Amino acid sequence: MNQVTIQWDAVIALYILFSWCHGGITNINCSGHIWVEPATIFKMGMNISIYCQAAIKNCQPRKLHFYKNGIKERFQITRINKTTARLWYKNFLEPHASMYCTAECPKHFQETLICGKDISSGYPPDIPDEVTCVIYEYSGNMTCTWNAGKLTYIDTKYVVHVKSLETEEEQQYLTSSYINISTDSLQGGKKYLVWVQAANALGMEESKQLQIHLDDIVIPSAAVISRAETINATVPKTIIYWDSQTTIEKVSCEMRYKATTNQTWNVKEFDTNFTYVQQSEFYLEPNIKYVFQVRCQETGKRYWQPWSSLFFHKTPETVPQVTSKAFQHDTWNSGLTVASISTGHLTSDNRGDIGLLLGMIVFAVMLSILSLIGIFNRSFRTGIKRRILLLIPKWLYEDIPNMKNSNVVKMLQENSELMNNNSSEQVLYVDPMITEIKEIFIPEHKPTDYKKENTGPLETRDYPQNSLFDNTTVVYIPDLNTGYKPQISNFLPEGSHLSNNNEITSLTLKPPVDSLDSGNNPRLQKHPNFAFSVSSVNSLSNTIFLGELSLILNQGECSSPDIQNSVEEETTMLLENDSPSETIPEQTLLPDEFVSCLGIVNEELPSINTYFPQNILESHFNRISLLEK
């Protein structure tokens, strides 16, 4: 009897299991009812109660049994009434379970199935975090991913919202983990807002909004490491060759490597251009197996490629000249970064070096041929020399010391000629300033025959000599050898009489007004009113000297008609009175009018400097001395 009962239990269990595998317990034809409190889906770790109520015809159940996943529960079962029982679970932690209950009826050899139900426990979704949308180069899709948080253990759905910032159009995409959105379906421009909403039976959460620009989320095509080689240089180095099919110009990459026995990655970063095959150099330990990975991103952007598949390379024990070897690739993505870089061409590795070597050989051969031609061909050598002489400046090959060709000598000669031409102008500016001026009076000297010889002529003259003597200022010109020291003095006041006729003749020079015609003697008509001592020079010398002073001083602009008349009179007296026997002091008196004109020539006021340059007077007095001799 017991064996029959066991067989019936096995048949019922197999039937239930078969029915569950083809549709679940919920498809069983129930002879009662089963329910779960608080719900069939609940938060993991809660206390739950499962109720079973029988509704079998012609059966008053003696016992009610609970099964979880095909295993009979023997504890925590409570009989509520004749047809109902309860199974209680504390801190239920199983994500999924299948529950059913049976009843023992009188006059039945096996348990009768009442009903069954699936229960689930889990968690509400976390807020989706780290929402990322990228466009892999050449894919044509925008791939959006996010961090879903902890596992919910129950069915959770995610809705991706994409809203255009330009057209305000919003699209929703239902998914369970990530989503690929065709770029052709994004017709709302380049700028979008993206956010993710997560929901399950226990709750709903929404992520933050992500603003994207379609041009900023492009990731270059994957980089691939192709081969490695170790070169025996001064210090052995390993070169890793890698490439990418990207069309993006500015790309930043990272390469990481480590020994297979090590857990720490070494990372190098660099910028590159995939016009050429990339070469990354490493100085590694010999006889050690290393692993390499690489990834890239568009320069200045946020998103990186996933790490490339693993590439293995073992450094040799004794480094040969060049060792090349390709290794298998393992697919493994994660990690850190690195690499220093030099570029090589897309052709073979040694082709660039061979081309450089051939170029150097051709250049050396051509140079040797040209050198031999220059040595044995004289005309060729002469032609080259002429062309070189035309190109280089003359001062590189002129005779040294050939001073006549020197530019410095020519410059000095030009400066010397310029100074000689301007010497007459420069001498006007180098004379010292006259700082001492004194007034003197001529002492009275009255010989015994003074009244007899000169009374008549003095009384018969119509010329107003008293006014001239009172108002005229003269300048004393001393001997040339002692320097020029002018002295200004006035004649004796009115009522004083000179005692010597010779003194009057030498100091006043008062001929008749009509004795000389200004039109017939233009050489003398422009001289100022001044007098010279006749004891030192003759009348001819005085005439020449006065003419030269006229040319130098150009007194026509400053001499008044009265002064010109006095000049004519004084010149006449110089020509008439040339007695060398008279003894008069060597002192020359110059009128103020003459000195005033000289001050104007020097562009200075006569009241400040009533003199003229000494060198000019010296030159003219030297000429007078020569005429005397």
UniProtKB/Swiss-Prot annotation:
Positions of the Fibronectin type-III domain: 127-217, 219-318
Regions that span the bilayer: 356-376
PTM section of the record: Phosphorylated in response to IL23.
Gene Ontology cellular component list: cell surface; external side of plasma membrane; interleukin-23 receptor complex; plasma membrane; receptor complex
Residues carrying covalently attached carbohydrate according to the record: N29, N47, N81, N141, N180, N232, N262, N273
UniProt entry keywords in alphabetical sequence: Cell membrane, Glycoprotein, Immunity, Inflammatory response, Innate immunity, Membrane, Phosphoprotein, Receptor, Repeat, Signal, Transmembrane, Transmembrane helix
Expression (tissue specificity): Expressed by monocytes, Th1, Th0, NK and dendritic cells. Isoform 1 is specifically expressed in NK cells.
Protein location: Cell membrane
Cytoplasmic topology ranges: 377-629
Main location: membrane
InterPro entries reported for this sequence: FN3_dom, FN3_sf, Ig-like_fold, Type1_Cytokine_Rcpt_Type2
Disease connection: Inflammatory bowel disease 17: A chronic, relapsing inflammation of the gastrointestinal tract with a complex etiology. It is subdivided into Crohn disease and ulcerative colitis phenotypes. Crohn disease may affect any part of the gastrointestinal tract from the mouth to the anus, but most frequently it involves the terminal ileum and colon. Bowel inflammation is transmural and discontinuous; it may contain granulomas or be associated with intestinal or perianal fistulas.
Quaternary structure and interacting proteins, as annotated: Heterodimer with IL12RB1. In presence of IL23, the heterodimer forms the IL23 receptor. Interacts with JAK2 and in presence of IL23 with STAT3.
Family as reported in the entry's similarity comment: Belongs to the type I cytokine receptor family. Type 2 subfamily.
Name of the protein described by the UniProt record: Interleukin-23 receptor
Source lineage: Eukaryota, Metazoa, Chordata, Craniata, Vertebrata
